[in-house]
Amino acid sequence: MSYKGFPSHSKVSKEDQEFYDLKNKAAEYYRSNGVPQKIESVLNEMFWQKPDDIYGYLANYFSGLSYTPVISKITGKEVFDGRGLTAVQAEVHCIIRNEEKMVCGAVMDGSFDGLPDGVESGEMLSNGDLQHLSITMALKWIRENFSPVLRGFNPTDQTNVDKILSDFAMARYLEHKDSLIREKEEELRNEAMSEAPPQATPTSAPAKDKKGNDKGKKGNITENPLPPAEPPVPRLPGATAVGAVSLAVAKTAAELLGTPLYRHITAVRDPQAQKEMQLPVPIITIMSCGKNSAGKLNLLEEIILMPSSSLRVREVIGMGLDLQCEMRRILNGSTYKALPVGVSDEGALQVGFDRPEQALDLLAEACANLALPLGSDLHLAVNCAAHSLMDYSRGKYEVMSGCHKSPDELVDIYEGLINKYPAIRSLIDPFRKEDVGQWERLASVIGQSCCLLADAASNLCPRWREAKPLPPGATKAIIRHHSDMTISDLIQSIAEHKETILAAGSGDASMVDLAVGSGVSFLKLGGLRGAKRMDKYNRLMAIEEEQEGIAGAGEINQPVSFESESGWNSLTVSAK
């Protein structure tokens, strides 16, 4: 028996033939993939460069030739967020150089989806069934829907990943909305069936009813009824999976590309924007005198420092820290010594005052002692959080304990504060969103001296949910990265609203990267207490240093200045 490649007179065993065939296949396999040429090339290059770490050099060389990592699966876990509420963590696993690895994870605030508007954190905890349903549904979506569909996707393809997430959420939202409508219709039918038939009416009854109706009409002439609260927007249980997966994919892409997350988000938004990087101006919650404080005053939920865009991040933080120390020193004096002082949930100084003037006078005194430029490089915003102050039984706002004011009376209070303290340049949520007449009247009264911002009074939504216009007179909405919003939703919302404020929630420091990458103008991080908040401030400082002081540079697109007549007061937003 002879075999090609061997002498004709030789005899080759079956094992030798198989081994020879195997060697030929191996040689062909390596030749077809260019392995000999690449090995020869890297060995030649390495010889001339003579690196200290030979195998590290080889590893880097061949890593550059490996396939692009793709998503292999997405997993979900139930965790706790920064406020101790249950939340969903999404983790992205990729095939990297033939091995499956967990690359990055992301946790979204667990309190948003499936919960009614205006619910406080304590109420969320008591409503454990609804929260548990939302978390369970989110984990199911990740496991059964998102993971199979996104398998094989390049993590850098953020736009298409987000479209898949949004399309799925939209379909589920429409189903959920139809289900709620059917439940309401069924409830109304059951109520109608359970009602007893009307009793016979005496002949004299119409005259009495007419008289009674006349009295009612007379009373209505003098009444100014409070507009009822709008029904809460239907939340979609499980939608937190959308935001968690979208953010986890973005963080995974940045990790695999070896680039900071903010640069990757910038590239997703607009590759050309890398040349015009802009840092947001940090605004700091310096004091809280809201409902949770020990004093009678409820109205000033947050007093916020609004610095000029010319100040660097480190300068702004330094001013805020100095100001807090000085206010504490003053509070320890004889004038204020009896006032209860603590730290709010937002990480700010929490003081129990009885009147708004006391808080603003304290702040003005501290700024004067430190020679801080209050009214020039530093201005104030006041978050009134009026939606939380409404006493519906009285139809008035409880601005102080036992002191109730009508919406019209509240307009006069705000006008007086702005006239007395001209450093106040913004009021956040001065009324409920339903009090449209007072929004409009206050905007007319204060004119260009102050602008009105909507936070809780706004309804910015992901693309798959209906948005509503801002209250009349409000010049801007404060945007939040809600748990049911994708990265693309956030970028789109910011692009549609110029000179935007982004409020970071209880998430990690990646919110700062999202703010920088999405091109937001102002970043609301809360107070200067708490490790997680200071991590965010430190992250913003690190990005500023990396950008070599790009914030406030003349050739860069600067955020709007509060002193400019073409600034906030000239901006209008028709829809969120």
From Swiss-Prot:
Positions of region (Disordered): 187-232
Alphabetical UniProt keywords: Glycolysis, Lyase
Low complexity composition bias: residue spans: 196-206
EC top class named in words: lyase
Keyword Lyase applies: yes
An individual GO BP term: glycolytic process
Binding site for substrate: 302, 524
GO cellular component term, pick one: phosphopyruvate hydratase complex
Enzyme Commission identifier(s): 4.2.1.11
Pathway involvement of the protein, from the record: Carbohydrate degradation; glycolysis; pyruvate from D-glyceraldehyde 3-phosphate: step 4/5
Chain intervals with Basic and acidic residues compositional bias: 207-217
GO terms for MF: magnesium ion binding; phosphopyruvate hydratase activity
Catalytic activity: (2R)-2-phosphoglycerate = phosphoenolpyruvate + H2O
InterPro entries: DD_ENO4, Enolase, Enolase-like_C_sf, Enolase-like_N, Enolase_C, Enolase_N
Pfam (any one): Enolase_C
Stored Gene3D superfamilies: Enolase-like C-terminal domain, Enolase-like, N-terminal domain
Similarity section: Belongs to the enolase family.
UniProt name for this protein: Enolase 4
Gene encoding the protein: eno4
